[in-house]
Amino acid sequence: YTPVHPRRKRLTLLEPDEIAAGANRVRLRSENANRDVALIYVLFCTGAKPIEIARLEVRDYLNSDGSIRERSEMRPETAVNGRSRPLFFTSSRACAAVDAYLVERRRRKLGVAVPASGFDVYRGLDPSSALFLTEGGWPFEIGGRGPNDQRETCRLMIATLRSIFKRAGWTGVTAQSARRVVARR
């Protein structure tokens, strides 16, 4: 008798050019292309968990003058472990993708600032609005995992990322494997 060893899952690691090619496929196949491409790049740029990405706010990405916060901070209330940590927006592709998405948001008047606060700060967006919104213009809903497990999750963000990975043509890629790519760099 020879025991059969279960197949180990092959770790899917994407190179920067594969990420860019996948982002281009998403741009062609998605109804919310700017947001979806920005989500890809923010995931691979920051290594944040899906729930943390759902909790990011405009002020985490932008300074009040509208410039990008290249060295930001994952606020304690955003981080899963409740501790702040550095958050870097230094990838030119990631910043270009998020900027294109924010231009679209302002054009569609999603999460814009009230006129009294002025349209010249935070590029006219409400600094406390979620950085990423659903197709309907709402923040991604965060809730408990179940009746016996009160830890928080963001099912819609996870489903959105799965859908994006499928559109990108990436098999075996998950948010967790994307985070491993960041950890290995």
Positions of predicted regions on the chain:
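Conserved catalytic core of the tyrosine transesterase superfamily
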Residues: 1-185
